[in-house]
Amino acid sequence: MSQGFRGPTGVFPHQTQPCLDPSYEHSKWRYLQPRGSESYLRSFQLQQIEFLKGRLPEAPLIGAQTQSLPPFLPGHWPRFPGPPAQGKQPEIWGFPRSVTLRNQGFHIGPPLPPPHSRGPPWRGAEGLCSHFQELSISQNPEQKVLNRLEELGEGKATTAYALARELRTPKKDINRILYSLERKGKLHRGVGKPPLWSLVPLSQACTQPPRAVNSDKEVPRGEPDLDSEDGDPASDLEGPSELLDMAEIKEKICDYLFNVSKSSALNLAKNIGLAKARDVNAVLIDLERQGDVYREGATPPIWYLTDKKRERLQMKRSTHSGPAATPAAVSEATQSTSFPTCHPPQSGGSSSMATSKRVENGQEPVTKYESRHEARPGPVRLRPHAYHNGPSRAGYVASENGPWATDDIPDNLNSIHTAPGEFRAIMEMPSFYSPTLPRCSPYKKLTECQLKNPVSGLLEYAQFTSQTCDFNLIEQSGPSHEPRFKFQVVINGREFPPAEAGSKKVAKQDAAVKAMAILLREAKAKDSGQPEELSNCPMEEDPEKPAESQPPSSSATSLFSGKSPVTTLLECMHKLGNSCEFRLLSKEGPAHDPKFQYCVAVGAQTFPSVSAPSKKVAKQMAAEEAMKALQEEAANSADDQSGGANTDSLDESVAPNKIRRIGELVRYLNTNPVGGLLEYARSHGFAAEFKLIDQSGPPHEPKFVYQAKVGGRWFPAVCAHSKKQGKQDAADAALRVLIGESEKAEQLGFAEVTPVTGASLRRTMLLLSRSPDAHPKTLPLTGSTFHDQIAMLSHRCFNALTNSFQPSLLGRKILAAIIMKRDPEDMGVVVSLGTGNRCVKGDSLSLKGETVNDCHAEIISRRGFIRFLYSELMKYNHHTAKNSIFELARGGEKLQIKKTVSFHLYISTAPCGDGAHFDKSCSDRAVESTESRHYPVFENPKQGKLRTKVENGEGTIPVESSDIVPTWDGIRLGERLRTMSCSDKILRWNVLGLQGALLTHFLQPVYLKSVTLGYLFSQGHLTRAICCRVTRDGNAFEDGLRYPFIVNHPKVGRVSVYDSKRQSGKTKETSVNWCLADGYDLEILDGTRGTVDGPGKELSRVSKKNIFLQFKKLCSFRARRDLLQLSYGEAKKAARDYDLAKNYFKKSLRDMGYGNWISKPQEEKNFYLCPVPND
């Protein structure tokens, strides 16, 4: 018999004595509770013991709120019913309160105080403070459910849904509790859906044992009262056993593969005692993830041990076979621990003790117990007892009795107090780098580490050499959307060259690559016996030449500088005018582990292929290989050129502080203004952002006001109908201002371009346009072609004029401009420009010439050019003819353009119609050529056909072969309004001249010298469309023309500075027109109405009426009274030579099979103007 007192979870035996009455034990309970911080310390020490035995996943921490001890398995800790309880043990939902356990074998700390000792009254309050973290206000959820069912009464049942609603608990938690109580034999589940739950009658509960969870386990269930306290132990029984089984299977698999070298899953399963392959498949996959095994083949796979796992097993077996690790030493090092089992007195029975088994660190003891009878049939609950806490000073643990003091650790777990012989096997076990094992040289280790990730390889090498390796962030710069990080490797205080990149990960990798390159060269020199000169290299020295054995690194900082390799390659190809393609060569491997093989193709050149587990990584690696190959080619070509200039780097972003090419920023105006602004800000080290200033309008038509901010400077606000469009327009406006300021700074000779605040550039642009001395002799575009200069002049003028206008009014930047050069050496000046891509609707035609029928950019720029010619003719005087662009023609009746003066047309894309009717694959590269000969393409009969524009839309359709005579009333009633395409009109200009019929009364024909395109350029298709299709059959057409008309063949080409890529979506309906005579006043039209954009629908200055008005003024100024009384149509017909040439031109097109030229209704030209007096 044993004398003891009962604790919250069992008996703490001290000496043998008959068991006392439970009431007596209950009266003594409150005196025998552990006090205050002493209880906390002992509980903490028990948690240390559990951690050392491997039952806790983490070491307990003193001073922190530690979790309670895990529920004790019935097979490990004996449980006994405690004294009768009159209350419930408070606990947090689902987590029982931690309790203090004691037994004779694990008594830790000072001896127990006498049972009648009491502390001072102040100790209770301080003890409460020390146990404040253990307070709880919740209740056992199982007890809540039992109480609720008891309230219903015996024989009453309810559903889980009703319980969940009454207890305000999720239904899934209630279901889990109900089924747990059913397994314990406390509840009865009725049939039906949903099942009805009720309490088990008392008589049935006495005879019905709890249901076993797992019959093949030899550990009995705990008592119902403690199960309600600690929760359902089923999960605790299943987890460790399954883990042990998994570990055992893994060990058997590895041992078998170590002996046979390879095997299939089925063969493995049969040789380790299992039946089917599926029993080991999951374990094999887990081992494969851990890097212990690998497989080859697909159906079925053959499994092998990895080299590293085989080395570890070999080392383990050699260690176990050594003299130090003998079985006697191992058995001597561990002690068996037995837990006494005490049962309540049973009639005619004897208490059975659990068989003691050896417990090793990190394993769960599996102990078999004999069956025992329950002491009481009903549930017995523990009750919290009031007691006086210990002194508060015990909460501060003294150093000599600290949580890890060796005296408090049990002897079987205390390695310090253990005899030296017990752990001799462990202490004498050779380490991985023991001198008894061969150790590789630093050079060999570095070579192995270079095959891995640079950061991981460097850390592994530092650990190999017992050194510390740190990655220090030296500097962080750049805007928030594209920061720059500079990292440096420091090994044992030695600093290596830093590396900079756009992300911390890439910067660390680059710094690790540099450090490993230096260490590799030093180790190689040391192994070869050479003096270690490289080890004394200064920190600033950046080893650019890699070692011979160094494999290519995963990131090339000199090439990409933090950018994606794919992005860098595409930018490089774009600058070179080439297009690259990523080709998927093959796809191998299963679906869960594919291998993609990619290569980069640039034209006919193919770069080395690479393989990777994903398409994205494969493309990046292929781009890296292509960039490295391109850089090597560039370096070789630079070496071959003796005395040549330094070639620029492939990646211009390595020098972000240099001035960006304005052509690149102009490209963003036509593609992605947001990206262009961010690129501009990054190149200058500024941060860019877009702010929503205001939002108004109804939900179906909102208006968003956005404003761009770059480097603390706000740019003009814009208004749009969507947030996306608002950001684009704000970026567009900011780019125009910044580009204009950059151009001004370049023209004035500044070395660096900084954002300039202040006045508008309109006056500056006007002065530059009119003052030849203000122009620089050459454009600030090194190596640019003639067509690049034409394009730059056009965009400069457009940007300077529109930098203060809302971009939403300016269309999608389909720009056309006419540039005038006074001599071949002149840089040129823009005399007219226009934007737009719309035609007037049929219901907006005017009988008075008040609408502009065609608002395409090319047509608008030509009408502005006509206005420029009128202004120059009004200024012409034979006394000042030296400064004029005109001179007297042969016969003296008319004027003509001077021989040195030339006009050049720029269009940002191919003209609509036949000039753009080809596949983009036929596009030609920009080549500087002095040859002006044309090579038109005639591949099929449809090429060269006349085409008309689509009303209220974009694109063209071919004209019908039959005669079409559009009528005014037919169009008003809904007949399709036909407008000839821009390619057909440019063809007419190259035959009849740019001046038109009215100016032919005063001028000889004016022809274009060149045509420049920014996009969709094909020399064969463009020349066919704008001039060569009328000479397809020879010179017959040109021979039929009367003097002074000819077939003009202008020089054609495309720009190389930028390429305005295609944008999806329709262009806007607005159109801009300007000529040099207008100063810096822009006019914005609505292309579908043909009038000035706005509610007033004002008359445009490029309309027929206004141009006819200028013609009348010129007639009055030149004393041509015979033309003042004519209508618009009659005045055009009065130019007999022009009218005859036009009719011949139309007839020839019809005879050549190109179709009929469709004109507007004749009624539209029959309007008159009052005579204009000579001012």
Curated annotation (Swiss-Prot):
There is a cross-link at residue 368 (Glycyl lysine isopeptide (Lys-Gly) (interchain with G-Cter in SUMO)). Residues 550-561, 638-648 have a biased composition (Polar residues). The modification Asymmetric dimethylarginine is found at residues 30, 42. Residues 214-224, 357-376 have a biased composition (Basic and acidic residues). GO terms for biological process: adenosine to inosine editing; apoptotic process; base conversion or substitution editing; cellular response to virus; defense response to virus; definitive hemopoiesis; erythrocyte differentiation; hematopoietic progenitor cell differentiation. Residues 135-201, 243-307 form the Z-binding domain. The keyword Chloroplast does not apply. Residues 207-239, 315-384, 524-561, 632-652 are annotated as: Disordered. Residues 662-671 are annotated as: N-terminal extension of DRBM 3 and constituent of a bi-partite nuclear localization signal. Residues 453-521, 564-632, 672-740 form the DRBM domain. SUPFAM superfamilies: dsRNA-binding domain-like, Winged helix' DNA-binding domain. The active site is at residue 858. Residues 225-235 have a biased composition (Acidic residues). Pfam families: A_deamin, dsrm, z-alpha. Residues 741-747 are annotated as: C-terminal extension of DRBM 3 and constituent of a bi-partite nuclear localization signal. Detected in brain. It is an enzyme of class 3 (hydrolase). Sumoylation reduces RNA-editing activity. PANTHER family: DOUBLE-STRANDED RNA-SPECIFIC ADENOSINE DEAMINASE, EUKARYOTE SPECIFIC DSRNA BINDING PROTEIN. Catalyzes the hydrolytic deamination of adenosine to inosine in double-stranded RNA (dsRNA) referred to as A-to-I RNA editing. Homodimer. Homodimerization is essential for its catalytic activity. Isoform 5 can form heterodimers with ADARB1/ADAR2. Isoform 1 interacts with ILF2/NF45 and ILF3/NF90. Binding to ILF3/NF90 up-regulates ILF3-mediated gene expression. Isoform 1 and isoform 5 (via DRBM 3 domain) interact with TNPO1. Isoform 5 (via DRBM domains) interacts with XPO5. Isoform 1 and isoform 5 can interact with EIF2AK2/PKR and UPF1. This is Double-stranded RNA-specific adenosine deaminase. It comes from Rattus norvegicus (Rat). The lineage of its organism: Eukaryota, Metazoa, Chordata, Craniata, Vertebrata.
